[in-house]
Amino acid sequence: MYLGRHFLAMTSKALFDTKILKVNPLSIIFSPDAHIDGSLPTITDPETEAALVEAARIIRDTDETVAFPTETVYGLGGSALNDNSVLSIYRAKNRPSDNPLITHVSSIDQLNRKVFNQPHLSGTSLFDNIPSIYRPLISSLWPGPLTILLPVPSSEHSALSKLTTADQPTFAVRIPANPVARALIALSDTPIAAPSANASTRPSPTLASHVYHDLKDKIPIILDGGACKVGVESTVVDGLCNPPTLLRPGGFTYEEIVKLGGEAWSLCKVENKKTVEKGEKVRTPGMKYRHYSPSAKVVLLVPHCEGDGILKGVDRMERLKRLIETELKANSNIKKIAILTSLKLRDSDLQSKIFNEPDFSSKTFIIERLGQSGEEIQTNLFAALRKVDENDKVDLIFVEGINEEGEGLAVMNRLRKAAANNCIQF
């Protein structure tokens, strides 16, 4: 049972002197089967070990939260077994409570012991609580940015907080690959509910500084393990329905899911809803409410299909010039404009055909390159949005989109949500 969207009015005024604790991911070493049998890591750096022990104590013994790096984005974690900890997550983020949370575990063994309340018995399989349809995927992709949906255990057999599921019959779970995240979960021996560690609706954080910007004074500790390598949230799949469904594109591509999932995933469909209807329940995070949005307006330049004739014969620079003119006419207060480029827009063309345009002489333009491959663009996306919004303080952001294949499916999913209705064929 969730508490309803508006319970956040109960937010307490308690503030923290938020500490950033440096940790070294390279000093954390797991055995090859630790994600299965739950073996604890070896930590060679004393400073890293001390920070993790302190953070693990907060997760295990208090109702508070800790921000920590994962391979996808920074997460804001609290005990998935403690209603008050889950409430602390919702309060710190100002997140509606009908938006479910992903539970992170360090191993299959921990999933069984702590979520299903089933200690491993001799002669039984550690995988008994995981439907067989998922096993090809998790054998290849765990630890990693893959989240699966499992049936919620009966209440008498599980301590999993109902607040993590938003009153759904399923819960979302994954084993992260980042060694800091894995070590935190393992040392606390506590499944951790963790959405992205940003203020609700903001772009997800891929650096500890992003977390500090949004959640300073709202949480006690941020573990700084450097930049996140993937750059967008995990891929969420539902193998409990027929056909199986990719609910949220993320760190693993649709193509990888189909290739590695075996025959059962060959007909995997993609959830096409941009958002759900008011009052409709969601099975996974990211499907409801405004997401990934800077303060500045975002205009997404959606690449048109080759040969469809939508913009045939129209020069991209001329098209972009007209779009800028339209925005300036609608809002005379626009002074600084950012253009986030990817595969086709070139700095030299922007300089000669846009920035030197006499009509724009009073405006400041900033170019931020996202990358030349889907992987680079995915990794850099949220950091680039935050840079131009928070550091450069622009008034308007244009983003050059990419085709929705490979990493492009996750990239465009995030950008469409950031831009809302401001998506222009380009």
Swiss-Prot record:
One GO term of the biological process aspect: regulation of translation
Null mutant phenotype: Causes increased leaky scanning through AUG codons, +1 frameshifting, and read-through of stop codons. Also causes progressive telomere shortening.
Domain of life: Eukaryota
Limits of the YrdC-like domain: 49-252
Coiled coil: none
Places the protein is found: Cytoplasm; Nucleus; Chromosome, Telomere
Predominant localisation class: cytoplasm
Catalytic activity, reaction form: L-threonine + hydrogencarbonate + ATP = L-threonylcarbamoyladenylate + diphosphate + H2O
Signal peptide (UniProt feature, chain positions): none
Recorded GO CC terms: chromosome, telomeric region; cytoplasm; cytosol; mitochondrion; nucleus
Positions with a binding annotation for L-threonine: T72, H104, R174, A194, S234
Its biological purpose: Required for the formation of a threonylcarbamoyl group on adenosine at position 37 (t(6)A37) in tRNAs that read codons beginning with adenine. Likely catalyzes the conversion of L-threonine, HCO(3)(-)/CO(2) and ATP to give threonylcarbamoyl-AMP (TC-AMP) as the acyladenylate intermediate, with the release of diphosphate. Required for normal translation, by ensuring translation fidelity at the level of codon recognition, appropriate translation initiation selection and maintenance of reading frame. Also involved in telomere replication.
Family: Belongs to the SUA5 family.
Full protein name: Threonylcarbamoyl-AMP synthase
Organism: Saccharomyces cerevisiae (strain ATCC 204508 / S288c) (Baker's yeast)
Protein's gene: SUA5
